[in-house]
């Protein structure tokens, strides 16, 4: 029920032509306190595809605080995923079973797998089996964290790798961009976006399967400008989620200038 005179915010968005969009951003919690995380969920849960409990912060934080964050996400109907770093460390230290037991035990829905700074000693099939035995979904991150910007041949290899992970049950694929979107993945040393290579990932997997890391404003706006509102973004800080989503809907002044983002003008009458 509307709590004030006039249209609700959702009704107003419809009046100005903004379409209803399914959640297409996976923001991350870089180690906020539980109250802050829950406040963001209260404000933006309807905009979140899956919440990443990122880096290894949740492992060294007070466990009760981590459990409180996960419980809040569950109350708001937002699934959760761990970052790829702890997974890689667990594999390298030969403790993947214990890590998976921990993730399942605290109530995470999904883990992120990857080879960003290590080389896996286990096959995708083995990892898929271990995750499945514990009721965990998994996604896979494509690309090295210290390997520089992608080349065409590297992109082709990553597409093949992504297909291998999808074949064993990966729910989504993530294209690496780290925290800088510069000198890594689809961004060169100057931060220039390689649209041609990005399109190869979309052509291979489609928007519903591939997510692009967009850790800062330039990378977020560049990806949305190029692909439009359908592109799935991740590694967006929680406090930047609303900015990304107004841009996605053409409500940001810069986005309004782009025909593929600007809402269609409603008919008169």
Question: What is each of the regions a protein language model found here?
Answer:
Residues 1-70:
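Conserved N-terminal beta1-alpha1 strand-loop-helix module at the mouth
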Residues 4-11, 197-269:
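C-terminal alpha-helical cap/extension of soluble enzyme domains
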Residues 11-14, 35, 58-72, 89-98, ...:
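Active-site-adjacent beta->alpha loops and helix N-cap segments on the catalytic face
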Residues 21-36, 54-59, 81-95, 114, ...:
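Active-site mouth loops of central-metabolism enzymes
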Residues 28-29, 52-60, 88-90, 100, ...:
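Catalytic beta/alpha-barrel core
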Residues 55, 106, 110-116, 162, ...:
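Glycine-rich phosphate-binding active-site loops on the catalytic face of alpha/beta enzymes
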Residues 95-100, 153-166, 216-229:
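Catalytic cores of alpha/beta
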